[in-house]
Structures are given as structure tokens and as C-alpha cells.
Amino acid sequence: LEIKKAEFITSMAQYGQFEGVGLPQIAVAGKSNVGKSSLINKLCNRRSLARTSQTPGKTRLINAFLLNDSFHLIDLPGYGFAKVDKQEKLRWGKMMQDYFEQSDELRHVLCLVDIRHEPTEDDKQMNLFLRQMGIPFTVIATKADKISRGARQKQLAPICRALLVQPWEIICWSSEDGTGRDQLLTLLEKVLAPEEEAPEA
């Protein structure tokens, strides 16, 4: 898969406002400041397609991007930012839950975690929620350039334990040096491939 075209479509407070239905969707989820915007920019080879912010919790809306005129990348609000009041957290939680329950086009979720830290309670909750909903996902361990190659495997162990995945199922990612980009593009190609119709009996 090659990303030849990428454009920002809309921001929305509720998924019900989205008019771009009909195309498959890939959602990007993760806590605030885990590098979602940077991943989207690197994936699309565009420096400022998704606005990156030094202020965690900036993405308070669901942002939709159209890639290759053939699928949508849905950037979900970052969760788990301490400075946000309880009401706002509840609103975010409902916004995301509504999206997962209402989107018929969702094919896969990219769950971003920082490779340098153990997954938070919010990461575990998201993981459990996706499993209960039966939504396929892949864990993306971001900021891999911040640690040595040798340390990566060691850092993956607590992530695997917390999120019940195997090391080979995780994509180590760096928006700085492009680590994991080819792997992620291959995953998207597989996920977006039209489902083969079962042969008639």
C-alpha cells in the first residue's frame, strides 16, 4: 500500500455528524501525547496533515482524514489526560463509545502506547473494551527511536502482559526515523483488502 493522497475532511463532536460513510475506516486511539498526530503525518508523508500539539489533550474532537480516496483514518480524542475535569472525561468517553458502537465501516483500530512506559489503566480499559466489542486491533509501540534497538524487546514485555498480546503482534513505531512505517502500510493493505466472497455451496 502506498499513500498517494491524504486530506483532512472534518472534525466532529459526535460520530453521528459524519457524512463520509460508505468507505472502510481505520481508527487511531491512544492516550494524550502518545504521538497520534505524528503517526498520521508520518504515515501519510505529510508534515502537518494532523496538527501536533505540545499540549496533551488538544484533540477533543473526532478528526477524519480521507486517504487515497478509498478509506478514512479516524483520529479519536486522546484519553487519560489528568488536567481535564471529570465531566470532560465522561464526555470524551461517551464520544468514543458512540463511535465504536455506531460505525459500521470500522475495520481495525491502531492502539498507540508509548514503548518507554507500561500501559496505563486507560490503555487497559480501551484494550478490554475492544475485545468485548470484538473489534480487531493492533498495538503500536510509539517513540521507538527514544530507546536502543536492544532495549525494545525488553520494553515490549510489560506491554504484552498488560494488553494480552504477543511481541510479534506489536508494531514498533517511530515518527522520527520511520521505523515501522512499512509494517503498518502492509497491515493496512491486508485490513483494507476486499473480503473474498465465500464460494457458493
Can you annotate each of these PLM segments?
Residues 22, 48, 61, 72, ...:
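Helical mechanochemical/support elements of P-loop NTPase systems and associated helical scaffolds
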Residues 65, 142, 184:
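Residue-level signal for inorganic ion chemistry
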Residues 1-83, 200:
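Conserved G1/Walker A P-loop phosphate-binding module
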Residues 94-168:
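Conserved C-terminal guanine-recognition region of P-loop GTPase G domains, centered on the G4
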Residues 39, 109-110, 184:
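Hydrophobic packing within well-folded, soluble alpha/beta domains
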Residues 79-89, 145-148:
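Flexible beta-alpha connector loops of hexameric P-loop NTPases
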Residues 3-15, 146-201:
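Canonical P-loop GTPase G-domain recognition
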Residues 45-49, 102, 132, 190, ...:
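Conserved amphipathic alpha-helical interaction elements at protein-protein interfaces in regulatory
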